[in-house]
Amino acid sequence: MNKNSPTEFEMTATAEYPKFEFVSTRIVRHRQIAKDTWQMTVESESLASRTLPGQFFMVRIAGLNDPLIGRALAMFDMHCDSFGKPSAISVVYTVKGKFTQVLSRCVAGDEVELWGPLGNAFPTEPVDHLILVAGGVGQTPMLTLASAALGKRTFGNAAPPARSSPAGYAKRVSLCYGARTKEYLAGLPEFQSTCSDVHIATEDGSLGHRGRVTDLLTSLLNEPTQGTRRIACCGPEPMMHAVSELAKQYNTPCDVSLETPMACGIGICFTCVAKVIQPDGEWDYKRTCIEGPIFPAESICWE
């Protein structure tokens, strides 16, 4: 085996814990794409061919013992080789804390370790208008979701057939993306070339609407209804709570991608639990890394 080739080990699934792969590979591209925000691309044919929109990986820097645990990062993009075969994945992160500070100093050729794909994926039921709502770094899982929904690309071809994404299930995909200032907006060119329409809000008015991303969502929800609608949301918890309330007000299904801190990513440590309302009206703790990170918005105990 070429010493620069990824090393991959597949972990056996059980009734309680999912199948995932441990991959030791190298960074092929690492660049800053917004203020305090980086996009890292790593080579892995297996992860690129199996991962669905909304799923994530635990990431570690090889040989780094401080911090020891990995960091959960969602797939931002999937890349193909010259033959059109999935060959690499990208993650996006903001520099916040010791791990991401060290990670941001890594360069192409440095070794990293990933295990995944982890968690569930966004629903793929046919819909006329899919509205993506992202705040902060919450845009990360939205690019592949938009691509899959519009049928521009399929994902998870090597995953079990029941889990792979269908070839297009939305007629229109809108992105509502909010940030503090325009300097924090990441991946805009990719979203503008993928989504049907992109709507921007910045708190200081430096780009797009001056205000909150929920203002943009309200405007879209007030458009004359043309068929079915669904919302997918990721970002700070107060924003997702507000989006959940709007979805309820407009009787629109909404899925949220939770960003709870986690240590293992495979359901063992229970550090990522969230309060989820059960069918009987009571709540119970659910692991974001196993039962999530995607949940129906109305099932989350926001208070």
Language-model features: locations:
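FNR/FR-type flavoprotein reductase catalytic core
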Residues: 98-261
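Short, charged beta-turn/beta-strand-edge "cap" motif at the junction between a beta-strand
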Residues: 62-66, 116-121, 278
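A charged, well-structured terminal subsegment
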Residues: 295-303
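N-terminal acidic, proline/glycine-rich, low-complexity intrinsically disordered segments
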Residues: 1-6
